[in-house]
Regions:
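Detector for outer-membrane/organellar transmembrane beta-barrel domains
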Residues: 282-289, 293-380
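Membrane-embedded beta-strands of outer-membrane beta-barrel proteins
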Residues: 232-234, 267-271, 311-315, 359-361, ...
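Short loop/turn motifs that connect adjacent beta-strands in outer-membrane beta-barrel proteins
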Residues: 199-208, 238-246, 275-286, 319-327, ...
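Outer membrane beta-barrel transmembrane domains
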Residues: 209, 246, 339-433
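Cleavable N-terminal export/targeting peptides
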Residues: 1-206
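Long, hydrophobic/aromatic-enriched structural stretches that serve as scaffold segments
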Residues: 228-273
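Transmembrane beta-strands of outer-membrane beta-barrel pores
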Residues: 215-221, 238, 250-258, 273-275, ...
Length: 433
């Protein structure tokens, strides 16, 4: 059955969105049966593998003129997609295993059959594919768009949580300068406990414009597969006052799984509002940040990709116990929806409708006037069906922050959930102008 590569590739881009172990060495496996023969072929590129199968090429050439069934083990889900066709290549059926949806096509010739299937992929099949993706995203430990700590939704939520919550102290709402008021508790600057010298008299000043840049890298294990991940991120921040600011940030991530490559990108616009600032009577900082996001992912090898839009709110509450010690709590909720993309008469929808909740605690200790150490952990959970519905992320490291507000942090990061573990490093710096 010589089905054109153009609709095979586009169809699989729509049907993509996950990858997990089919065999120990392959992400995807096709098993063909017909005329008493069985052939099983695996690979890490779904488009190349299924293109060979449905076009009865290479190892599948013997099934060209016989009744045959092709079953795709898609990311460890047996019979995720099953295609049957007759010996004359004029009738075929397509079944999505996770949803039970079956579509049958009957043509007057092989060309007519191909045209019917192509029309289905372009027009009527969108809802079937979206339902299929939503079902399989909830079953794959290394789905691309959703359902695990390495997916796009988790990355988008993690970026906002780190920026506005867990590591919110790197973003400076204000700087300190000599003034007529005592230095606020919890702010840098204070008396020398060894010499008994008086604390410098400081007052808050608007931090103004600042740039934030960083990178992280991890190696991870998900199910039977291992991979690596690298992320670069950055943000531009402006404070209208010591209480209200604007933050525009983004990240670009790349990860491998098996021999497949995956790319993620996200953009976040937030409005940090400092409801409480530390002072003599209130040793607390409380910041609330509503934000909106747009992101997406793509993988030619896995045939996955799609656009995701969402937003949420982050709360950061810090208790400045003393001049040295600070205990902070961060809480966040985000919600994401997949958005359709159209190209060459095809539509791609990642099948995402997901919420993410994150809660974290972090303690920091000032070692010197500028150097400090920190340690903490966060707990994340998906509110909708997911293959890994929750995970814990510890972090520990050291940082340097000047009174002017600029500084840098470097430390260990990890993610640990059911059938998933990742560990690596993070480095980030903030420059106040």
């Amino acid at each position: 059955m010589r089905i054109a590569r153009r609709w095979v590739g586009a169809g699989l881009m729509v049907m993509g969105g996950l990858a997990s172990p089919a065999l120990a060495q392959n992400l995807f496996v096709v098993t063909a049966t017909g005329n008493g023969n069985t052939v099983t072929v695996g690979g890490d590129s779904i488009i190349d593998l299924v293109d060979s199968a449905v076009n009865t090429q290479d190892q599948f050439a013997q099934f060209q003129d016989v009744n045959a069934t092709f079953a795709l083990n898609y990311g460890g889900i047996a019979d995720a997609i099953t295609i049957t066709k007759n010996s004359g290549n004029t009738q075929a059926s397509l079944t999505f295993g996770p949803t039970g949806t079956t579509r049958t096509f009957t043509g007057t010739s092989q060309d007519d059959l191909e045209n019917q299937i192509e029309d289905y992929l372009k027009k009527q099949g969108g809802a079937d594919f979206t339902a299929f993706l939503k079902a399989v995203n909830a079953q794959s430990v290394i789905a691309v768009s959703d359902g695990n700590p390495n997916a796009t939704t988790a990355r988008m939520a993690g970026w906002a949580f780190d920026r506005f919550g867990f590591s919110a102290d790197q973003r400076k709402a204000y700087t300190l300068r000599p003034g007529a008021a005592p230095a606020p508790q919890g702010a840098q600057g204070g008396g020398d406990p060894d010499t008994g010298a008086d604390a410098p008299v400081m007052e808050r000043a608007n931090a103004g414009f600042q740039l934030y840049v960083g990178a992280s890298g991890q190696s991870y294990s998900a199910g039977d597969f291992d991979g690596e991940s690298a992320t670069i991120f950055g943000a531009a921040d402006f404070n209208f006052s010591t209480r209200v600011g604007l933050s525009l940030g983004s990240f670009l991530a790349y990860n491998t799984v098996g021999d497949a490559d995956v790319f993620h990108v996200g953009l976040t616009l937030g409005v940090p509002v400092r409801l409480v600032l530390p002072g003599e009577a209130t040793p607390f900082t409380w910041q609330v940040t509503p934000f909106g996001q747009v992101g997406g992912s793509g993988s030619e090898d896995i045939g996955a990709g799609g656009l995701i839009i969402g937003g949420g709110i982050t709360s950061y509450l810090a208790w400045h116990i003393s001049d040295r010690w600070t205990l902070a709590m961060a809480n966040q909720y985000t919600h994401y929806e997949g958005e359709k993309l159209s190209f060459s008469d095809f539509e791609i929808d990642p099948g995402v409708s997901q919420g993410v909740m994150k809660h974290g605690l972090r303690v920091s200790c000032r070692l010197t006037e500028c150097w400090y150490a920190y340690a903490g952990a966060s707990y994340s959970t998906f509110t909708d069906d997911a293959s890994i519905d929750s995970w814990v992320s510890p972090a520990v490291g050291v940082g340097y922050g000047s009174i002017a507000g600029s500084g840098v942090q470097i430390g260990f990061i990890g993610d640990y959930g059911d059938d998933y573990s990742a560990s690596g490093f993070r480095i980030a710096g903030n420059l106040v102008f």
